[in-house]
C-alpha cells in the first residue's frame, strides 16, 4: 500500500531533471565521464596505418552527354526460332522442276544472298554488342542477349536459303531487322498452314525447294490420287477434311451428293429420269429440289386432295340444316327468372341445378301451363312439371318457395316430388307465386290427371320448411 501512495499518477507528465537554457546548455556538467574537448589533437595517421587501409577512389562520369537513349535489354530475346516470311504468289507459281543449268544459277544467287544477309547480320550483332556494353544491368544479361540474337541470325540465314529465286534479298534491311525481332509463334504456325493449303490446292504435283524433295513428291502422288477419286464420283465412307480445299465441300463423301440436292435432307430418292447415284434428291427437305419442285416434304410425298391428271378437287359434302325442336314452339313464357332448384331426398335438400325458370302457357285451346327449367351453358332440362289446381306453395325464408309436383325429369318417377326454388330477390318470389295462382287452374293432360295428387311421404314438415 505504501508503494502505491508514493507512485506517480498516470496523468502527470514526465519532466526534465534540469532546466536547459541558452546560458546553460548542459555542457558544463560535472560528470566524471565527460571531458573537455581539446583543440589541435587531430593529426594525420601514420604510414603503417595508411598502408593497412584500402583506399577506394570513385570516378564519376557524365552519362547525360555520352550515353545513348536507354533501350530495352530484352528486345532481342525470342522464345521461338525464326522462320522466313511466306513466299509470294509469284514464287509459288514458278515451283516447277528446273533444268541443271538453272539450278546451278539459282544456287549461285542463293549463295550471294546468303553472304549479303550474313554481312547485315554481323553489322547488327556489332551494334547490339555496343549497346549491351553500355547497359548497367550486368554482364550476364548482355551475354545471354547476344547468344539468343546470334542464334536467331543463324536460323534466319538458313531460312533465306529456302526462299525461291532470292526473293527475300530484295527486301530492305529495316524490314529484315523488324521481322527478326517481332516474329512470334503465331506467325510461324500461320505460315506453315498457308504453305500446306497452297500445296494442296496446286495438287502437290511439282518438286519445291532443295530440301525435302522426296516428301514433296510423295505428297504430289497422294494429291493426284485424291483428284482421280473425286472425278470418278467414288463415295468413300468418311473423307478427311485435310484432303479437301477451302473451295470444296468437306461433307461431299458422306452421302454421294452431299448437300447439293437440298439444304437439309433425310434419305435419298432417285430423281425423275436418272439412272445413276450422281443425281439424287432428298425425300424430306427444307430447300429447293433439283427437279424444280418446292415441296416441303420432297417429290415422293404426292398425296393431296387435288390430282394433277384430272385437276378436280374433291369437296366435302355440306351438312344439311336440321331443325331443332325444344317442345316450346307452341308455348308462351308468362314468367322468366334465374333460380336454383333443390329436391328433398333422404331427409335433406340436394341441389339439382341452376338456370332459367319459365312458366310456359300453351297457345292452343287447352291453355295448359307448366314449369320448365334448363341449366345454363348446356341447356339440360332439369324441371318439367305441369301445374294443377290443388298445387300448394309454401314460403321458405325470404327468397325461397317450396311446392310438390310431378317432375318428369326427377329420379322418382312415380308420385310427387318436393322441390324448392331460390331466387335472387324477394319480389321475384311474390311475382312467381302470383303467376302460379293464376294459371294453376288450367286442365292438365289425361296422363297427369290420372296420377294421384297427394302429398309425398318424403315431403318435409312445416318445421323443416
From Swiss-Prot:
Span list, region Disordered: 1-44, 59-244, 308-330, 439-465
Keyword Transport found: yes
UniProt keyword list: Acetylation, mRNA transport, Nuclear pore complex, Nucleus, Phosphoprotein, Protein transport, Repeat, Translocation, Transport
Residue ranges, annotated region (3 X 2 AA repeats of F-G): 266-298
Biased composition (Basic and acidic residues): 105-127, 141-157, 216-233
Modified residue annotations for N-acetylglycine: 2
Localization (cell): Nucleus, Nucleoplasm; Nucleus, Nuclear pore complex
GO biological process per UniProt: intracellular transport; mRNA transport; protein transport
Biased composition (Low complexity): 81-97
Domain of life: Eukaryota
Residue ranges with Polar residues bias: 456-465
Modified residues (Phosphothreonine): 455
InterPro entries the UniProt entry points to: NUP2/50/61, PH-like_dom_sf, Ran_bind_dom, RanBD_NUP50_plant, RanBP1-like
Sequence repeats: 266-267, 286-287, 297-298
Primary site of residence: nucleus
Complex and partners: Part of the nuclear pore complex (NPC). The NPC has an eight-fold symmetrical structure comprising a central transport channel and two rings, the cytoplasmic and nuclear rings, to which eight filaments are attached. The cytoplasmic filaments have loose ends, while the nuclear filaments are joined in a distal ring, forming a nuclear basket. NPCs are highly dynamic in configuration and composition, and can be devided in 3 subcomplexes, the NUP62 subcomplex, the NUP107-160 subcomplex and the NUP93 subcomplex, containing approximately 30 different nucleoporin proteins.
Role this protein plays: Probably involved in nucleocytoplasmic transport via its interactions with importins and Ran, rather than by forming part of the nuclear pore complex (NPC) scaffolding.
The protein, known as: Nuclear pore complex protein NUP50B
Name of the coding gene: NUP50B
Amino acid at each position: 500500500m505504501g508503494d502505491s501512495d508514493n507512485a506517480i499518477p498516470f496523468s502527470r507528465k514526465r519532466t526534465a531533471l534540469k532546466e536547459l537554457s541558452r546560458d546553460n546548455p548542459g555542457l558544463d556538467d560535472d560528470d566524471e565521464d565527460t571531458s573537455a574537448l581539446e583543440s589541435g589533437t587531430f593529426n594525420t595517421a601514420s604510414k603503417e596505418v595508411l598502408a593497412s587501409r584500402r583506399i577506394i577512389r570513385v570516378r564519376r562520369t557524365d552519362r547525360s552527354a555520352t550515353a545513348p537513349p536507354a533501350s530495352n535489354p530484352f528486345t532481342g530475346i525470342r522464345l521461338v526460332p525464326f522462320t522466313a516470311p511466306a513466299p509470294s504468289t509469284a514464287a509459288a507459281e514458278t515451283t516447277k522442276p528446273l533444268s541443271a543449268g538453272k539450278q546451278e544459277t539459282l544456287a549461285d544467287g542463293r549463295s550471294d544472298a546468303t553472304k549479303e544477309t550474313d554481312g547485315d547480320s554481323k553489322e547488327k550483332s556489332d551494334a547490339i554488342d555496343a549497346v549491351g556494353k553500355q547497359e548497367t544491368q550486368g554482364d550476364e544479361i548482355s551475354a545471354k542477349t547476344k547468344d539468343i540474337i546470334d542464334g536467331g541470325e543463324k536460323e534466319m540465314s538458313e531460312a533465306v536459303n529456302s526462299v525461291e529465286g532470292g526473293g527475300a534479298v530484295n527486301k530492305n534491311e529495316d524490314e529484315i531487322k523488324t521481322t527478326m525481332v517481332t516474329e512470334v509463334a503465331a506467325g510461324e504456325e500461320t505460315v506453315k498452314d498457308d504453305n500446306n493449303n497452297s500445296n494442296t490446292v496446286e495438287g502437290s504435283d511439282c518438286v519445291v525447294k532443295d530440301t525435302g524433295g522426296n516428301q514433296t513428291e510423295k505428297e504430289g502422288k497422294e494429291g493426284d490420287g485424291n483428284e482421280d477419286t473425286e472425278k470418278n464420283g467414288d463415295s468413300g465412307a468418311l473423307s478427311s477434311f485435310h484432303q479437301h480445299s477451302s473451295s470444296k465441300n468437306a461433307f461431299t463423301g458422306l452421302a454421294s451428293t452431299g448437300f447439293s440436292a437440298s439444304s437439309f435432307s433425310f434419305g435419298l430418292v432417285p430423281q425423275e429420269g436418272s439412272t445413276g447415284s450422281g443425281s439424287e434428291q432428298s425425300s424430306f427437305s427444307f430447300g429447293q429440289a433439283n427437279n424444280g419442285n418446292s415441296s416441303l416434304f420432297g417429290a415422293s410425298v404426292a398425296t393431296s386432295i387435288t390430282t394433277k391428271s384430272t385437276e378436280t378437287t374433291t369437296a366435302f359434302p355440306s351438312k344439311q340444316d336440321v331443325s331443332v325442336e325444344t317442345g316450346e314452339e307452341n308455348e308462351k313464357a308468362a314468367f322468366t327468372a334465374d333460380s336454383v332448384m333443390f329436391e328433398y331426398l333422404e331427409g335433406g335438400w340436394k341441389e339439382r341445378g341452376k338456370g332459367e325458370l319459365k312458366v310456359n302457357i300453351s297457345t292452343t285451346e287447352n291453355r295448359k301451363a307448366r314449369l320448365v327449367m334448363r341449366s345454363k351453358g348446356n341447356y339440360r332440362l332439369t324441371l318439367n312439371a305441369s301445374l294443377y289446381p290443388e298445387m300448394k306453395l309454401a314460403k321458405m325464408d325470404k327468397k325461397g318457395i317450396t311446392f310438390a309436383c310431378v317432375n318428369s325429369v326427377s329420379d322418382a318417377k312415380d308420385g310427387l316430388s318436393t322441390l324448392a326454388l331460390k331466387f335472387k330477390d324477394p319480389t321475384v318470389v311474390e311475382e312467381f307465386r302470383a303467376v302460379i295462382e293464376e294459371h294453376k287452374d288450367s286442365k292438365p293432360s289425361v296422363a297427369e290427371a290420372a296420377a294421384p295428387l297427394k302429398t309425398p311421404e318424403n315431403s318435409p314438415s312445416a318445421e323443416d320448411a
